[in-house]
């Protein structure tokens, strides 16, 4: 709209007064000096400073920005010319942008309604499309060969705030009818680009299409963001006429004309930590059963699958990403796949990840294409220009992508995610566009076997039906089987029945996956951490004494714990952990070479070595440690061993592992504090060093447990089912600090035979 010169001059004086007497003691005058010195042409004004100086002016800038954008630009340009007369050319202006709090005018693309048209808004979202940067003519210069005169003409479109829009036709003749020649070298242009901004996936309404708004950026704001970036854009929301350039239909196209673009980090919706939260997190990390606690807290409505839940926890925590000086990128994100029979809660586990992970995007194999997962080059319907559109994996940068029905995806589409899973980038080279986008995300996929149900007579590779090049990119591959066991079936049926019978106090059904259930308050100090025990909901599976009612964390606290450990803890490998990883990897390689063909779900390759490092680092994050210890490597090997060979550790091995973790945690805490922590002080006596006595058969329970642990670990690592007594004696004495006599070895083996754990015949011990 046209503004009279008197009002323009008054608005300009108001901004000059703001620049001369700004509250920040000359902050903006210094900003103008820096702008002139660095040859920039945009000044950002904070709304808080403008409100403190003139509240009425700040309100009018937001409500009617069309009246104040040009006076603000003229005021800043005048100050810049006073500092340096040569800074601006004739007719050139300094552009002005705004930042800071906008109150009710801080919205998402879904909240942009007709009431915001003509006002200044701050919109937050994620960039999904970017057009090519095109020049737009601002001033054309024409030469008349007959008269020898030059003729210039300025152009303004509907997006301009200065004056009324002009026509876009080039003049071909002057007023006397003489032909004109356009001097393209003397014309003035400015860059412009169109963006498409969509509401962030985690905040979009379920069951509704995400809303999108077109953004027009010009001059220095072009190419300031790329598809997948989360941005906060301040601009004027305007209505533009359609292609017919008329308003007969009464339908207009709305755009956001930006004056300031700010990049947001990936954790824009990060939780807020209190001092009490940090204290409780450290208490949880010092527990011996932290891994089991987090695993049980994830999707408590799903019965069993504890090892898979533990793996999902490690996946959400992730390892440590490394970018070496030579340009090598080592990914820290963990990829995981579940293959198994129908009705084993694979999809429900994916939904649990969607509920817990800070950023997660869900797709399906049949409903997703290769370009939909990575990136696509599309054409603008109005201009016909090529645009780069981000896919699900680019939008989930620094998050998790959940792909259900992975086996239903076409082979051509499945190949498209190979680069993402290993290099964590999406490279596009088509239609004249060559670009590389970041897709640093974890992938968790669920698939059914190729025959519908898992055929135990075939190898895992033949059951899965996916190429090895894709399977090797998954760090963990779990075979989830529908076990036909009457006892397990009874427990599952009781668990499902309790889920359906669970009601609130008023008799209504209550959601089991929402935070309302998780934050149920029982008046206790730990109410915000642990879920209140309910016999109908949790059943009778309570163990371990007094702490039995506090073995599940609330959803809210679990989100905080995972977010804190993932982003603020960056562990590094110790020498002891590195040596143990190398030794364990060599044993896995040797075991896979000696095992039968197809004995494991995944081949043991160099990627498996990186998998052990990532899992160990994730476990150290879970324990809130800044160093990866040997116990972290052991926990990672347990998860990896279950994924590859589908074998769980025995109770004896679990007890040995817990003792190792407790000892290393106590040593680590004592080294950090210089004293004892939680009553676990350093002692000169090892718990395994006991007095055997004069009688060889007087073996303590600790020595028996240590013997059984050594034997179990050796059998598990080498995948053997029988050994001679001589070999067992040599092995345990080689690994143990206190040697065992022959009679002690035979005595312990006889005890194990009485417990039906081994069978001894002709000097050969067969493991049952």
UniProtKB/Swiss-Prot annotation:
ATP binds at residues 340-347. Residues 661-670 have a biased composition (Basic and acidic residues). One of its GO terms (molecular function) is ATP hydrolysis activity. Residues 661-689 are annotated as: Disordered. Residues 290-497 form the MCM domain. Residues 672-682 have a biased composition (Gly residues). The keyword Protein biosynthesis does not apply. GO terms for cellular component: MCM complex; nucleus. InterPro entries: AAA+_ATPase (IPR003593), MCM (IPR031327), Mcm3 (IPR008046), MCM_CS (IPR018525), MCM_dom (IPR001208), MCM_lid (IPR041562), MCM_N (IPR027925), MCM_OB (IPR033762). GO terms for biological process: DNA strand elongation involved in DNA replication; double-strand break repair via break-induced replication; mitotic DNA replication initiation. Keywords: ATP-binding, Cell cycle, DNA replication, DNA-binding, Helicase, Hydrolase, Nucleotide-binding, Nucleus. Belongs to the MCM family. This is DNA replication licensing factor MCM3 homolog 2.
